[in-house]
């Protein structure tokens, strides 16, 4: 599907970018693809990636999604875009909400506008469960990013740039997530700091995150939002699973929720569930293609309306201790940390 095509990954030196490149480099995709452009701000991470991967099809572009000119110039000749650049730390965004807006909303606007201007065929925008019923600045900014993508999709004609969204739950062992924190605390013989033991989170691997984006890329229609069905766990069970894996007797210390945290996360709202397509391992939330001429809808109505529960980390499949251990032991990150323990 990428034969002789040019792909851009914004925020490409982050966890998602590394996971995509790892997948591509282990398959025939890299042989078929024309070029992969990594667009990000950090020249040190780009240099590290350039040396580590040493692949002539990788091209590196220094720039910031906040700067339209830099992203527009880098996108010349690009066929597809995976937009992963974001501010995603919830407490940080609570203290600096305008920074979240500048990157997650205005930056996304720049990426989408540049893609349309450069006649990119398809853009996949990466979002988060925190965009559903948002209570924090990060979630609010991502919700607005989704609205931007869908609004622009609604205005596209047949044959123009296709804009789709993917929503993630908690991506295990991604940068800034709780699993690296717990492992570091175990190695340093410190207490494992748990915010709220009964708090639940979806558990997705980086492999799952790539699967979701590639599924959306292959099946996405204009304005679609895609969600992968995922299991969940309480934070306490996750911490205990890591204790057992690493043979740790560290104490668990409960510290209370951080700024902007929710007790559980939702991947699909109840309103969206009423209209979502169940695709087996995924949900597709189609774009509402109606226009602002509401008079005709007073007569036609909306056919697909129902009262359904939202899809959240409390009502999805809940993993027990042994199931969480099995999931964790399949992660490359955990395997590497065990070797170095």
From Swiss-Prot:
It comes from Rickettsia felis (strain ATCC VR-1525 / URRWXCal2). Keywords: Isomerase, Lipopolysaccharide biosynthesis. InterPro entries: CapD_C, NAD(P)-bd_dom_sf, Polysac_CapD-like, Polysaccharide_Synthase-Rel. GO terms for biological process: lipopolysaccharide biosynthetic process. This is UDP-glucose 4-epimerase. Belongs to the polysaccharide synthase family. Its EC number is 5.1.3.2. Epimerizes UDP-galactose to UDP-glucose. Coiled coil: none annotated. It catalyses: UDP-alpha-D-glucose = UDP-alpha-D-galactose. GO terms for molecular function: UDP-glucose 4-epimerase activity. Pfam families: Polysacc_syn_2C (PF08485), Polysacc_synt_2 (PF02719).
């Amino acid at each position: 599907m990428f034969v002789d095509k040019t792909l851009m990954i914004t925020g490409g030196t982050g966890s998602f970018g590394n996971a995509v490149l790892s997948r591509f480099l282990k398959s025939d995709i890299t042989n078929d693809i024309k070029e992969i452009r990594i667009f990000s701000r950090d020249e040190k991470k780009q240099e590290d990636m350039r040396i580590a991967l040493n692949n002539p099809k990788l091209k590196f572009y220094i720039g910031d999604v906040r700067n339209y000119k830099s992203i527009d110039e880098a996108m010349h000749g690009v066929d597809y875009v995976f937009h992963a650049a974001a501010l995603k730390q919830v407490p940080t965004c609570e203290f600096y909400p305008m920074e979240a807006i500048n990157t997650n909303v205005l930056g996304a606007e720049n990426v989408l506008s540049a893609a349309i201007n450069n006649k990119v065929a398809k853009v996949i925008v990466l979002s988060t469960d925190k965009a559903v019923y948002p209570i924090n600045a990060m979630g609010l900014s991502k919700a607005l990013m989704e609205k931007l993508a869908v609004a622009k999709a609604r205005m596209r004609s047949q044959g123009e740039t296709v804009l789709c969204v993917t929503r993630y739950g908690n991506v295990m062992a991604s940068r800034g997530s709780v699993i690296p924190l717990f492992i570091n605390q175990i190695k340093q013989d410190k207490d494992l700091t748990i915010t709220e033991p009964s708090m639940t989170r979806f558990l997705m691997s980086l492999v799952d995150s790539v699967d979701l984006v590639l599924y959306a890329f292959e099946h996405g229609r204009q304005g679609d939002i895609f969600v992968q069905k995922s299991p969940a766990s309480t934070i306490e069970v996750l911490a205990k699973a890591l204790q057992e894996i690493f043979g740790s007797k560290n104490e668990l210390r409960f510290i209370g929720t951080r700024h902007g945290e929710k007790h559980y996360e939702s991947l699909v709202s109840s309103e969206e569930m009423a209209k979502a397509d169940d695709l087996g391992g995924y949900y597709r939330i189609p774009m509402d293609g109606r226009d602002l001429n509401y008079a005709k809808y007073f007569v036609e109505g909306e056919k697909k309306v129902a009262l359904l529960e939202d899809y959240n980390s409390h009502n999805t499949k809940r993993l027990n201790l042994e199931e969480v251990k099995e999931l964790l032991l399949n992660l490359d990150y955990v395997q590497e940390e065990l070797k170095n323990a």
